[in-house]
Amino acid sequence: MINYSDIIEKAWSGYDPSRKIAKIEDISPQVSTNHVYKVTFTDEDFIIAKLSSFGKYEHFKEDHRIIHATANNLLYPFENLLAKSLLKNNRVYTYRYKKGKTDAWVVFYNPSRVMQRLPRRLDDNLIKSLGRQIGKFHLACSRIRNVLPKSSKTLRTDINTLQEMLQTQEKKFGNKAQVEMLRYHCEQFLKNRNKCNAGSFETIPVFIDWNIGNFSVVNKHELYSRWDYDWFRMSSRMLDFYFFSRVVSDAGDKTVFSYLISPMMEDRFLLFLSEYHK
């Protein structure tokens, strides 16, 4: 059994051992591959810690470096939108714990201020407001894309990695028929990616896993804060659209989802897109 609190303690000791931790509380949303903790100090100040063991440490470190640069370069009204990672020696501080079969890594955040949450099911006016806001946010991200650090990850490298795993770790993916189905869809994805000339799509920072539990709004439903960066990518804004289709769907936002195409076919998502493009 992995003692996650012990890893958090070690990570903080590497950051600032002069400040003592009073308690560590698991506040994970239970819908993620990451563990999230509230770390309270003896003086009652607190921070947020994220612990992950999914993927590679190098990618985790790279992502948070790009996210920090994004947060630092976004202009009004998004200059304070993104949760800020803690820095040490002017770099995002990350910690890697490696012992036996355990390989995990940690990053610390300043807590985000949370204002209004959107309801689980949005009405037409809220869908329109959200569409306009996301359009403005994507445009703001586009304007800073040329000054951000380069990312080593793309959708193509993701698929290549999956194909390698299907070759070398076949048993992890189920029976022969299931593995063949995955191989087929990997090949179809790469073929269709070429047909669409996806390499020509503009690359911007996208935060992908949008749901009403990881962002808040103010006033005329303007974006105020966003936290929880599980699936960050430097990629096409298209990646965000599927998750917004779920947020604005007739069924409303949920904690348990199936990855179905139907939310993107709803009139409610088309309404979102029409406002987005204004």
Language-model features: where?
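Active-site acidic catalytic loop and adjacent metal/ATP-binding pocket
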Residues: S32-F41, I48-A49, K191-L239
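Conserved short submotifs of the Hanks-type protein kinase catalytic core
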Residues: T102-V114
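An alpha-helical support segment within catalytic cores of ATP-dependent transferases
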Residues: I8-D16, N146, M165-I208, V218-H221
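Active-site activation/catalytic loop segments of kinase-like enzymes and analogous catalytic loops
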Residues: L239-H277
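A conserved alpha-helical element in kinase catalytic cores
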Residues: S52-K101, N125-K128
